[in-house]
Amino acid sequence: MAKILIVEDNPDNMKLFRAVITIRGHQVVGLPGGEQLLETMRAETPSIVLLDIQLPGEDGFQLLKKLQAALADALPPVVALTAHAMSGDEAKALDAGFTGYLTKPIDVGTFASTVEAFIPPA
């Protein structure tokens, strides 16, 4: 069982993401924004982080930079969650250091397989 940290401000999206992940036997830690992200990362040590790009306050790119600076080599895979599906958006996210990229609304099968692909073997 992996621990997955989800940073998502939309309660409906969080509910769906949590359901898809927990039905596969994984634990979810959810945050509605990035204010508690660093301390939650240190306390929970998740296997993977799903980080919404558009959050109130600091966006996903700003939060990723903070994580990279604070955790460096200890940073788990961080997958971008975004409604941005324009040409070049995925490349921009991957260039910034995101490990993966998922667009919303999600396809449940793609979402699940992407999350599973980034969970390290037990």
Predicted regions and their residues:
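Conserved acidic carboxylate
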Residues: 8
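Short amphipathic alpha-helix used as the core "switch/output" element in two-component signaling
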Residues: 39, 61-74
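Acidic catalytic/metal-coordinating carboxylates
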Residues: 12, 33, 59-65
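C-terminal output helix
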Residues: 106-115
